[in-house]
From Swiss-Prot:
Its cofactor is Zn(2+). The gene is mtnB. Keywords: Amino-acid biosynthesis, Lyase, Metal-binding, Methionine biosynthesis, Zinc. This is Methylthioribulose-1-phosphate dehydratase. SMART domains: Aldolase_II.
């Protein structure tokens, strides 16, 4: 990644470098929390109207460098970078295409998220109700509400999964979803918003799993 903008690039390389540092710091904290095991997980930030900064595939999230953050267009194609973006890039870019206000998408694989995805796969969703922390989600101003978190079937065909996500987005507002046996996607208008949604869902999923244990269901 060059220190100055290259005229041949269709995006601002300085901006990409800034976002790389912003993402690397946050991703490192997620890695320390154990949410990105074995090079899993991928993270992105809107670069401009037509491009996204996203993690390169297969990199250890504990020790990322600028070269581990690349640019893709809104179709998920690499732009100005020799490396390959995450196989799940389409799940990021579909959100940026659909919602111009979205600025950041986070995909993690914590133990809590993965176990919850298995437990609730049959139901197809998890209903989070009457938690004070529901106020952490954009558009929620009271605990007296219910947030449905979808659980999608895992597939290696990202086009199929993206279509399923789009279909549900036509029906309901959501700030995250689980993939069975996989992990969780969260997003927001800013990195801070996306992180708040991620941390809130992580905590609430942990609450739900602990309630199931206390009631003898797990």
């Amino acid at each position: 990644m060059n220190a100055t903008s290259t005229p041949s690039l269709p995006y601002d390389a300085n901006r990409l470098r800034e976002l790389a540092h912003l993402l690397i710091g946050t991703i490192g904290e997620f890695a320390q929390a154990g949410w990105t095991p074995a090079t899993s997980s991928n993270f992105s930030h809107r670069l401009d109207e037509h491009h996204v900064a996203i993690t390169v595939s297969g990199r250890d999230k504990r020790c990322l460098t600028e070269e581990d953050i690349m640019a893709v267009d809104l179709e998920g194609n690499a732009v100005g970078h020799p490396h390959t973006p995450s196989a799940e890039t389409l799940l990021h870019t579909q959100l940026y295409r659909r919602f111009p206000e979205i600025g950041c998408v986070l995909h993690t694989h914590s133990l809590t998220q993965t176990v919850a995805s298995r437990v609730y796969a049959g139901a197809g969703h998890i209903s989070l109700k009457d938690y004070e922390l529901l106020k952490a989600f954009e558009g929620h101003s009271t605990h007296e509400t219910t947030l449905d978190v979808p659980v999608f079937c895992n597939t290696q065909n990202m086009n199929i999964l993206a279509a399923q996500v789009d279909t549900l987005l036509d029906k309901q507002r959501m700030w995250g979803y689980l993939i069975n046996g996989h992990g969780m996607y969260t997003w927001g208008n800013t990195l801070a918003d996306a992180r708040r949604h991620l941390e809130a869902l992580e905590f609430l999923l942990h609450c739900e799993l602990n309630l199931l244990k206390l009631r003898g269901y797990l």
